[in-house]
From Swiss-Prot:
InterPro entries, alphabetized: SCAMP (IPR007273)
Protein name: Secretory carrier-associated membrane protein 4
Function in brief: Probably involved in membrane protein trafficking.
Species assigned in the record: Bos taurus (Bovine)
Gene Ontology biological-process entries: protein transport
Amino acid sequence: MSGKENNFPPLPKFIPLKPCFYQNFSDEIPIEHQVLVKRIYRLWLFYCATLGVNLVACLAWWIAGGSGANFGLALLWLLLFSPCGYVCWFRPAYKAFRSDSSFNFMAFFFIFGAQFILTIIQAVGFSGWGACGWLAAIGFFQTSVGAAVVMLLPAIMFSMSAAMMAVMIMKVHSIYRGTGGSFQKAQTEWSTGTWRNPPSREAQFNNFSGNSLPEYPTVPSYPASGGQWP
């Protein structure tokens, strides 16, 4: 947004890169939605941590006799889904609540729904998917109990992530329907281009209400000295 310096991600000074986004919950998100948006943000952090734990578990799986392809895919998922999760489903949710944007709500539901399905698949743990889910962990107990115990941790975390994602989808959808959002409104935002940088709720209110104070001269006008009152 104009006039506000990007502050996310908070990069160390020695890295010659600058933050890409401006993020301030108390400044941009209405107070009644701040808790929910923060929870979505923490869910993204938890999912990133889950991918990191899954990478370690896939390494243990590989060392104990599993396929190295799972470790390679786990590394790919960590490098891919960590930034993409922030950009593709957290930022749409953030912008949707910031400016009551139906287009961003729709983007969140579509992408976050796909993320939810993928997380369920990761929790199940099909072989060759690079995810230490329940099937992979339980099936590996016959080969290595130690590695299988390590593999149970990401299975639990993937399950928790999927459960929390389901709760977030229902909560956001309930709020979205309660505010009068619709697919038609999202189409209007798309056709007008306002979805790219939707104004904040405060800016929308100011544009709607305009200047609430009438314009009066700052100094009252009196008759000249010696004049007569009408």
